Amino acid sequence: MDAIEQLKQDVREGRIDVERLVDLVATLQRQLQTLQQQLRVANQHIEALQKQSGDGGQPKADQPYSLRAEENRQEARKKMKKRKPKPVRRGRLTSAAKIALAVRHEEVFPEGVAKQDCQPSHVRPVWRLEQGRAVVIAYHIYRGPNSRYGKIPGALGRSEFGIEIILEIAFLVYVIGLSFDKVSALLQFFQGLQLRKAQADALLYRLARHWENEFETLCTLLAHSAVVHADETGWSLKSVWAFVSEKARVLLFGVPKDAETLQALLDPATFAGIIISDDAAVYANFSAAQKCWAHLLRKAIKLTLQAPNDPDYRAFTDRLLEIYRSACRVQRDGRLSDAGRARQVAALDDELLELCAPVWVAELPKLTDETEDNYRLLVQEVMRLMLAKELFTFVTAAPTTQPNGVSQPVAGTNNEAERTLRGVAQARDTGRTNKTLAGARRQTIVVSVLESLRLYLPCFTLSSVVAEVERWLETGRSCYQKLLAKLKLSVAERPILDRVLPKPDS
């Protein structure tokens, strides 16, 4: 039984008097008045909101498909468009504004197609460097038969910047080590080119994608070089590994320092050249090696600094340096034949044996004094490298010739690779490094291709680099690919870059 039925029964049976019933009715009436007042306030609030929204209270047309209803809908759309704010431009010029800035207009036709057989297609403004200033040139692209379009000289795809500007940015960022902010400031101050950081970043990614095949060609040339300098250093992402030869300069950014990475570029089982490196274990399996004399001499000099009053350390260091200088003189002596140099190397081995024999023959255990133990380890290292014939390889090795015609003797130190990594180490110490794998891939490609041009050009300048790269764009073949074809070599089926630096997941 609900409350209403119970109340009726109580009234019929006389359990509820009349006064109590009147009080109950009055209470319900007051509650009803309160609710009605709240409803009126809510309706007034709704009407006010509809007036503020403008069209919120607009009555809907009785005939939705009539002419009057369509006019009402169009009028409502116009009001919405008027209220929509216009997008704010961020300083980028429109194509029409760039064309208005053009210093001249040039027509570009498809190669081998006459002008009368073509028709205008579109106009592309491109920023170029002329006489040290940034100017806009409007290229009128013509379309020929079979949808063949004219190709703008010195431009990558649909980029609005010439190749000379992209190469300048790459050199300033990766070779000189400037930030994007400083590069933008330099371009604006010296050449009058306003370039945002996002634009510079996008241009470098475009250049890296365009040069991926050139990087693979350089890796193949490196694997078939006569002499390779190898060195590595720490970085924000794992390590940086530099490989410098007479045919290529390859720098790998963000790779692990292990045998698998080294095998991807220089397989010890197949590499027939000489590798010049420090005494790291990862370089232990090559058939012909030259260990860096600078590392050994620095260790010996450190002993003399730790114990300046010890005559044995001083005598050992002086004698070791004298033997190295004697080896350099034997290498430069043009009067010696191959057999004569071999005899001189045997004599140098005897001198090293005489120098190290007292400590080496004693087979001393690990010593408690750190300096004395370092001296023991250095003597053992020198003897181990001498017995492995890895100290005087440079004396009997033939000089190497670079593609630009420069001939150089094989070095007894690894200073060439260390100098290549000097700027990278400074960038690491100051925090100016890539933090992503995509950035490491980009820097690997761009730096390797740019640095390798030093071996192919007689003079490494912006004008010479631009002229060479423009020739690549015109002929479709780089100087690296020409040398690869001359040597009758082919690149690996699986890209080496994807093996050492896999593409990040998109």
Regions found by a protein language model. Give the residues of each.
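Short, flexible loop/hinge motifs at secondary-structure junctions
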Residues: 1-160, 230, 236, 277, ...
